[in-house]
Curated annotation (Swiss-Prot):
Belongs to the IPP transferase family. PANTHER family: TRNA DIMETHYLALLYLTRANSFERASE. This is tRNA dimethylallyltransferase. The record marks 99, 121 as: Interaction with substrate tRNA. It comes from Thermotoga maritima (strain ATCC 43589 / DSM 3109 / JCM 10099 / NBRC 100826 / MSB8). Substrate binds at residues 10-15.
Amino acid sequence: MKIAIVGGPTAVGKTDIMIEVCEEIGAEIISMDSRQIYRYMDIGTAKPTPEQRKRVLHHMIDIIDPDEYYNAFMYRKDSLRAMEDVLRRGKIPVYVGGTGLYADALVRGIFEGVPADENIRKELRELERREPGILRKMLEELDPEAATRIHPNDLKRTIRALEVYMKTGRRISELQKEAKGDDRFFIIVLTRERYELYERINKRVDKMIEMGLVDEVKRLLGMGYSKDLNSMKTIGYKEVIDYLEGKYDFDKMVHLIKRNTRHFARRQIIWFKRYKEAVWYNLTFEDVGEVKEKLKKLIVENFSV
């Protein structure tokens, strides 16, 4: 038995395609999106609509509040529990989403062996406060491989990598390779040519604005959720907050959301290219109807192995 993980960049069309595919083969979707886990954040995370979620049962959406902590280790544990529940009911589970870190947690396993040390974390945060950028330089020197996988602005993961090194004397990138993988999964990636994908991203952002993204952010702030939360630094939310604080005008806000989403999509594609064994479908050149038929066949046949 092999379970499909269907990944790809944001706005490529994963949700619409996979809802139709899963509906026809009697499958349920396990979301693999690190932002759709948050309640109240619907428009900016492009969650499936209530109607779509009625057509196909979705798991791992709306599971925590925006101020709750969550990581890839927790996702792996919770989503595997959801997967087992789907299997018990005689259905086919299909993972769908663009969070490469979650795909890694499922396929390659995840290292979570060193307990957090608040003293070390406090020390590192203070060091960064005194000399911005110093932790990134330290990571590049101590663990170059981890530095290539951790975004320069991701202070939380940078601190975690340095914390592990300081506690164990070993690089987190080495320890992660020792994590136990899971051979029950296979990966499918949906993609499009850059020009088409970027056009779809721009249209999606325009639609989010029309649907009330600014009001959604205002509502979240009104509920008491801090702009400094990890959830509120999601692309779309961060730019709206800066706009509301008067850092730039409305048009600049829209421009930045589009630009940052395009950059994010490019990073997603690069991430999934690391899976040499993945099956890729380019929706710019392949007929979408034919791709759906191929997906149905591939998912069902692998599940039946």
